[in-house]
Amino acid sequence: MEFTPQSLAQRIIDLGLADSSQIDQVWAELRRANIDLETFKSSLLRKGVVTNFQLDRLLTGERLGFFYGPYKVLYMIGAGTFARVYRAVHRETGRVVAVKVLRRRHRDDPRQVEQFLREGKMGLQLRHPNIVSIYDIVNDSRTPYLVMEFVEGETLREILKIRKQFDPISALKIMADVCSGLDHASRLGITHRDLKLSNVLVSASGRCKLVDFGLAAMADTSTPEALADCPSARAIDYAALERGTGVRKDDVRSDLYFAGSILYHILAGTSPLTETRDRLARLNVSRFREVKPLGTIIPNLPQSVLSVVSKAMEIDPTRRYQTPAEMLGEIQMTLRKLEAAESTSTKTADPAATPETTPPEEDFLEGNGFSVMLVESKMDLQDLVREKLKSRGYRVLVFSDPARALERFSPEEPAPAHCLILSAPELGNLALDAFNRMLELPHLRDLPAILLVDRK
């Protein structure tokens, strides 16, 4: 469908994405009748009338998928095998949530719908700081969906792409959060069954939260034929491990094995398991027997850290950690030892320092306690700026889309960062428009912002 500025404005009003007064403000800003569609679109985005996600759908002629019940979709934040996840806002209260919607190809299968809703109900029981909460389950006849806690941050997979590896203390802190969430669930008789980097969310404050508890159970792994057609790679991994080691489905020790594989991955920067798209090859138990010892990849890792990884990833489940609480306890003990050793080495590095009056070196970094959001499209520059800021104590959130970065700032919630850096050399007018738009939004007007431009 071909839109004019006038017809696009009317479609926005008709669908309830904005009211006429908001559209009138756009017309007033433009101050002329004969404007082209591109200019009108830019003004809509700059004034926050619609998001990029909404605009893209509008321009393709879509009329559905903008609302789920009282929640208006702002943009898509994730897509998996069985569902898509959107950031959304309640039309009346302004509450920001995540809405998980069962994908269309699964909605016609009553068993899949029933399983999706059942797993949602299971998630309602889980209330823990290290688990993403489910607030509501909506059994809509056309589009069933879950209303969930929205976590301001990134997945562990996204962060690892930037950081490449984690130091032992940081990695163990992540795994302590993971095991704490698993422990809470296991006490209620619930296992995760889909532990992987993308199902660990890291909030802007650094807290890790598990998402998608039990949703992998939607994958049919009951027969070799079903496994061959199973779309969930991790569900196949769980089935292969359990069949190869003779344990029942839903054994919590399977979760602990894959928790150990996450710890291995973030320490080494590479997966312990041979990656393959061949589903039958994933069923071969030799993948689990041929894991390279972590110490051969990272020779200088403390033995206590290697021991945690090795025990979690024991192929024999009787030699593995038996409960999340057991694994959590050993991680916490190892953390205390590493932090004590680090503190001792810091004190002995400068014999003239007075321990009672001189705080640790990191207390002098000007960035301690502050977060910076960087918007940059080039991966190498993301890494460079991030490491420079990190060396000064700042926590850094990285985005490549200026519009999406601004959407992370909500007037109803604490700001995810204390400063915004927009890099214009690659992003061009997208970065400039976002920078200018900050002056028009009351909740962003006083946020410190830096626009980086090239020397030209």
Set out the residue ranges of the language-model regions.
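Non-catalytic accessory regions
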Residues: M1-R105, V113-E114
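AlphaC helix of the eukaryotic protein kinase fold
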Residues: R103-Q125
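Activation segment of protein kinases
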Residues: P110, S205-T245, T276
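Activation-segment/catalytic-loop signature of the eukaryotic protein kinase fold
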Residues: I137
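Conserved short submotifs of the Hanks-type protein kinase catalytic core
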Residues: S141-T155, I159
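Activation segment signature within eukaryotic-like protein kinase domains
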Residues: I174-M175
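Protein kinase catalytic-loop region centered on the HRD/HxD motif
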Residues: S180-I190
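C-terminal lobe helix-coil module of Hanks-type protein kinase domains
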Residues: L201, V211, D237-E342
